[in-house]
Swiss-Prot record:
Motif (D-box): 98-105
Gene Ontology terms, MF aspect: DNA binding; DNA-binding transcription factor activity; protein dimerization activity
Major site of localization recorded for this protein: nucleus
Stated name of the protein: Transcription factor RSL3
BP GO annotations: positive regulation of DNA-templated transcription; regulation of DNA-templated transcription; response to auxin; root hair initiation
Classification via Pfam families: HLH (PF00010)
Outcome, altering L101V: Decreases degradation by the 26S proteasome and increases the lifetime of RSL4 protein
GO cellular component: nucleus
Post-translational modification comment from the UniProt entry: Ubiquitinated. Ubiquitination leads to its subsequent degradation by the 26S proteasome.
Reported phenotype of the disruption mutant: Strong reduction in root hair number, density and length in seedlings.
Domain notes: D-box [RxxLxxxN] motif functions as a recognition motif for the ubiquitination machinery.
Length: 258
């Protein structure tokens, strides 16, 4: 369909200007003027109708098909977007909270497992230490019993041995008759050794083996002294005191004179 351009419209209006064409009104027929004016008015009306149809078709194509606002509740697009964002944010928040709860439960479970393992390890360690201490006590007890005859040289060692023996008896480590008899026998031997230490000169200052050797020499000295003192002729040769020296000279003298 033809559309008027700006220049054509002005020229057409100039052709129908009554001021310029007043002299030719009478010459042109009246029906010709009416036909031209009706043609111009129809053309304008048709052009406006075409523009209205195009604009209505364009909006009808864009709005109902691409953006169906009528189908939306309220027909408000920003409100719909805001509600969608809020629902999406709530879903993300709830999922994040669930993940945090799962992580906390897992951490609590792991911590409980660690505590249980530590308690089990501590109990096992205590049992091992107690068993080792019992073994050490038994070994110390056996060592004291075995060495009571050779290392109880002074009063303190003898008292410690007797105290330990009483402690073992109260604990019930030796409850059979044989062990009780052996313990009593050891106690009697320790008492006699203590008495012998007090009789032998310097017996409390040496160990058991040295003390027993000195006791043998001291007994020989006493025998020689008794023999010499009992003789009427040799009493002046009898030794007066035991000084730990060799008594061979006195024995030779006694055998030679007797």
């Amino acid at each position: 369909m033809d559309v008027f351009v700006d220049g054509e419209l002005e020229s057409l209006l100039g052709m129908f200007n009554f001021d310029q064409c007043s002299s030719s009104k009478e010459e042109r027929p009246r029906d010709e003027l009416l036909g031209l004016s009706s043609l111009y008015n129809g053309h304008l009306h048709q052009h406006q109708h075409h523009n209205n149809v195009l604009s209505s078709d364009h909006h009808a194509f864009l709005l109902p098909d691409m953006f169906p606002f009528g189908a939306m509740p309220g027909g408000n697009l920003p409100a719909m977007l805001d509600s969608w964002d809020q629902s999406h944010h709530l879903q993300e928040t709830s999922s994040l909270k669930r993940k945090l709860l799962d992580v906390e439960n897992l951490c609590k479970t792991n911590s409980n497992c660690d505590v249980t393992r530590q308690e089990l390890a501590k109990s096992k360690k205590k049992q091992r230490v107690s068993s080792e201490s019992n073994t050490v006590d038994e070994s110390n007890t056996n060592w004291v019993d075995g060495q009571s005859l050779s290392n109880s040289s002074d009063d303190e060692k003898a008292s410690v041995t007797s105290v330990k023996g009483k402690t073992r008896a109260t604990k019930g480590t030796a409850t059979d008759p044989q062990s009780l008899y052996a313990r009593k026998r050891r106690e009697k031997i320790n008492e006699r050794l203590k008495t012998l230490q007090n009789l032998v000169p310097n017996g409390t200052k040496v160990d058991i083996s040295t003390m027993l050797e000195e006791a043998v020499h001291y007994v020989k000295f006493l025998q020689l002294q008794i023999k010499l003192l009992s003789s009427d002729d040799l009493w002046m040769y009898a030794p007066l005191a035991y000084n730990g020296l060799d008594m061979g000279f006195h024995h030779n003298l006694l055998s030679r004179l007797m």
